[in-house]
Amino acid sequence: MSSTEDDRQVRISKIAGRYLVFDIDDVAYIRRQHGICAVFTGTMPQNPTQNVFLGLPLELYAEDAKMLLDRKVAYIADDPLEHLTQLKSMDDETRKSYLQSIKTQRRTAQLVFNEAKAQSMAKHKDKRKPKQPQPSVVVPTELPLSASSADGVAAAVDQEEEGGAEFLLESSSSKPLKTDASTPPQKPLVKEKLPAITPTTSNAMISNGTSNPDVENHTALPLYSYLNERGYFITPGLRFGGDFSVYPGDPFRYHAHYMANSYGWDEKIPMLDLVTSGRLGTAVKKSFLMGGQKPATEDSEAGELRAFCIEWAGM
């Protein structure tokens, strides 16, 4: 892990009770370093009428946000309040700094575009320029000329030379050459043209605050942290009938191995729920995982977490 990632603080925006991440670099960081996938909830600019492929922002579970806070790699910001406060108190210096950051992003986009264009032109240069066939060299053969034909050729050559000389004289007299080269032609000043961009975040406008609103504690947090610390990736499990879908690695590479539910340590679990969950997990080719943590007491903190897997073996 690089030093920049060691000091990285992920900004989690709390909006209407939801925990959202708007920066694509933060999304890549928490997925790569902390095994958090979460769910994209934004529309794609190229095709906003579909909901199969979604984009930023990334919506986190409350368990995700709490876990990142405990690891001290993120902070939660009350986004509406911070934006209103900053916009009302923005001075000229802050405004200039924000505009300069936008211009820097535009220059970066232009450099990336120019580099991609140069690579594309170099790649397709040979395809656009077909090879020219080599002209064949014909060696003329010497033929004997008669006296009359030789005189005719000489006369034609003399006439062509005289006509060429007259043409040169006429062109030189009608269009005199300019010899004054002391003042070179001045090029008109061209204003720098940069591509227009739409900023995806407003981080450059607001300061990096450290306000951390309270994150509600869910009963599923112990099981969630237990699985994450062991390298499992977790996504919503509604489509498989559980609270979570648990993957042994990145979901881009693996299928889910478990559908997981969290229970309280003293919570009574109906036997019918165990049977139906076990059968459902086996039907979707997964194991049903259930777990709970021993609660804290006056003498000790929260104890160990126990997890069990259930499979339906058949009749």
Curated annotation (Swiss-Prot):
Active site: 247, 255, 286
Gene Ontology MF annotations: lyase activity; nucleic acid binding; tRNA-intron endonuclease activity
CDD domains: tRNA-intron_lyase_C (cd22363)
Substrates-to-products reaction catalysed: pretRNA = a 3'-half-tRNA molecule with a 5'-OH end + a 5'-half-tRNA molecule with a 2',3'-cyclic phosphate end + an intron with a 2',3'-cyclic phosphate and a 5'-hydroxyl terminus
SUPFAM superfamilies per record: tRNA-intron endonuclease catalytic domain-like
GO CC, any one term: tRNA-intron endonuclease complex
Annotated segments matching region Disordered: 117-138, 169-188
Pfam families cross-referenced by the UniProt entry: tRNA_int_endo
Keyword tRNA processing belongs to the record: yes
InterPro entries: tRNA_endonuc-like_dom_sf (IPR011856), tRNA_intron_Endo_cat-like_sf (IPR036167), tRNA_intron_Endonuc_cat-like (IPR006677), tRNA_splic_SEN34 (IPR016690)
UniProt keyword annotation of tRNA processing present: yes
EC number: 4.6.1.16
Skewed-composition ranges (Basic residues): 122-131
Subunit structure: tRNA splicing endonuclease is a heterotetramer composed of tsp-2/sen2, tsp-1/sen15, tsp-4/sen34 and tsp-5/sen54. Interacts directly with tsp-1/sen15.
Role: Constitutes one of the two catalytic subunit of the tRNA-splicing endonuclease complex, a complex responsible for identification and cleavage of the splice sites in pre-tRNA. It cleaves pre-tRNA at the 5'- and 3'-splice sites to release the intron. The products are an intron and two tRNA half-molecules bearing 2',3'-cyclic phosphate and 5'-OH termini. There are no conserved sequences at the splice sites, but the intron is invariably located at the same site in the gene, placing the splice sites an invariant distance from the constant structural features of the tRNA body.
Protein family membership: Belongs to the tRNA-intron endonuclease family.
Name recorded for this polypeptide: Probable tRNA-splicing endonuclease subunit tsp-4
Source species of the chain: Neurospora crassa (strain ATCC 24698 / 74-OR23-1A / CBS 708.71 / DSM 1257 / FGSC 987)
Phylogenetic placement of the source organism: Eukaryota, Fungi, Dikarya, Ascomycota, Pezizomycotina
